[in-house]
UniProtKB/Swiss-Prot annotation:
Involved in protein export. Acts as a chaperone by maintaining the newly synthesized protein in an open conformation. Functions as a peptidyl-prolyl cis-trans isomerase. Consists of 3 domains; the N-terminus binds the ribosome, the middle domain has PPIase activity, while the C-terminus has intrinsic chaperone activity on its own. It is found in: Cytoplasm. GO terms for biological process: 'de novo' cotranslational protein folding; cell division; chaperone-mediated protein folding; protein transport; protein unfolding. The keyword Protease does not apply. InterPro entries: PPIase_dom_sf, PPIase_FKBP_dom, Trig_fac, Trigger_fac_C, Trigger_fac_C_sf, Trigger_fac_ribosome-bd_bac, Trigger_fac_ribosome-bd_sf, Trigger_fact/SurA_dom_sf. Keywords: Cell cycle, Cell division, Chaperone, Cytoplasm, Isomerase, Rotamase. This is Trigger factor. It is an enzyme of class 5 (isomerase).
Length: 433
């Protein structure tokens, strides 16, 4: 076998491979003998059919199969010999082919980029310094009370925090439009569900009032025919309701499965959950900054084959969100996933290089700690831990998580790390903050 390597544009490579004719003919002859020996032919005892007859019947198909197998096998031998690391499947193209002739073919493919990590010392990581305070726990308990609240009709004006039931009809230039009409529509005031100005027009109104408001649809509204349009809404208020919060007592506590200890036990459980969420949020914020810095400091070429693979993964995930509708997900445009796919490939390649250069292997103690920490969110943590330990696939998945965390730790060890005091709510709700 003769091999030459061509460097094409970017990460593209082309191998020119020549396979001696004897290799091809020997493989074809061997396969034809196998057919003659094992298949039945009318008028002949098994294994006694003339080879010329077998060659006439199957020669062309066998040669095609042999050529495909030979190209694949010699491609693998060639990349091993040349120490090349393909990033995707090759495209084969015969250059010279024919009975009794050497097989000359090309294999075109992409290779992984050569990554040389740099600039880790320039990465800035701001570590959040936060804790769960009594006030945070009290606020969370208030949120739980709101989630369990009931609504009671009141003889009061509509305002933020109250709920109204309304009939409305929307029109543009005197003409009603699709989706602009509803009856007994429940609207929680201040929730921001409607277009700007809609809720403002209802504030101060009471049961039975009928009125018209003027609003303008946002330029980025989802319905193309309504973007930026001025509209009128005729509205009737059917009722106004106020939220009634349940008392923080044993009956309320029982709704959350806390059998003993009353309110204090619920507070302790809430604090424990909040502290677990806080720990995860701090870890995620640090990881996000470390990876962002790594990507910024290390621009690399990305094999399109890997991007294509990642797009397929994202499409499959989209199909799961669509209830398993693979066909619907397949129709989604490539552009919808391309940026995210490229980002994931870049991060994967860079973290892989961090792991390689630091000779990292999954720390089994860290793996156990991650499983134990994750299991605390379940009713029976020991059962969850046991389930993981008995499932090799789940254990390998957790080893990958641990290895990625170790890679992030290696980045942070060389980065510029500072601490910043931040509240629990600011960390958990950065947009609202």
């Amino acid at each position: 076998m003769q091999v030459t390597v061509e460097t094409l544009e970017g990460l593209q490579r082309r191998l020119n491979i020549t396979v001696p004719a004897a290799n091809i003919e020997d493989a074809v002859a061997a396969e034809l003998r196998n057919i003659a020996k094992n298949r039945r032919f009318d008028g002949f005892r098994k294994g006694k059919v003339p080879m010329k007859m077998v060659a006439k019947m199957y020669g062309k198909a066998v040669r095609q199969d042999v050529l495909g197998e030979v190209m694949q096998r010699h491609f693998i031998e060639a990349i091993v010999k040349e120490k090349i690391n393909p990033a995707g499947a090759p495209t084969f193209a015969p250059v010279e082919i024919g009975e009794g002739k050497d097989l000359v073919f090309t294999a075109t493919f992409e290779v992984y980029p050569e990554v040389e990590l740099k600039g880790l010392e320039n990465i800035a990581v701001e570590k959040p310094a936060a804790e769960v305070t009594d006030a945070d726990v009290a606020e969370m308990l208030e949120t739980l009370r709101k989630q369990q609240a009931t609504w009671k009709e009141v003889d009061e004006a509509a305002e933020n925090g109250k709920r109204v039931s309304i009939d409305f009809v929307g029109s543009i230039d005197g003409v009603e439009f699709e989706g602009g009409k509803a009856e007994n529509f429940p609207l929680e005031m201040g929730a921001g569900r409607m277009i700007p100005g809609f809720e403002d027009g209802i504030v101060g109104k009471t049961k039975g009032m009928e009125f018209v408001i003027d609003v303008t649809f946002p330029e980025d509204y989802h319905a193309e025919n309504l973007k930026g349009k001025a509209a009128k809404f005729a509205i009737k208020v059917n009722k106004v309701e106020a939220r009634e919060l349940p008392e923080l007592n044993d009956e309320f506590v029982a709704r959350f499965g806390v059998a003993e200890g009353g309110v204090d036990a619920l507070k302790a459980e809430v604090r424990k959950n909040m502290e677990r969420e806080l720990k995860q949020a701090i870890k995620a914020r640090i990881k996000e900054q470390a990876i962002e810095g790594l990507v910024k400091e290390n621009e690399i070429q990305v094999p399109s084959a890997l991007i294509d693979q990642e797009i397929n993964v994202l499409r499959q995930q989209a199909a799961q969100r669509f209830g398993g509708n693979v066909e619907a997900a397949a129709q989604l445009p490539r552009e919808l996933f391309e940026e995210q796919a490229k980002r994931r490939v870049v991060v994967g390649l860079l973290l892989g290089e961090v792991i390689r250069t630091h000779e990292l292997k999954a720390d089994e103690e860290k793996v156990k700690a991650l499983i134990t920490e994750m299991a605390t969110a379940y009713e029976d943590p020991s059962e969850v831990v046991s389930y993981y330990e008995q499932n090799q696939q789940l254990m390998n998945n957790m080893r990958n998580v641990a290895l990625e965390e170790q890679a992030v730790d290696a980045i942070i060890a060389k980065a510029k790390v500072t601490e910043k005091a931040i509240s629990f709510s600011e960390l958990m709700n950065p947009v609202a903050a």
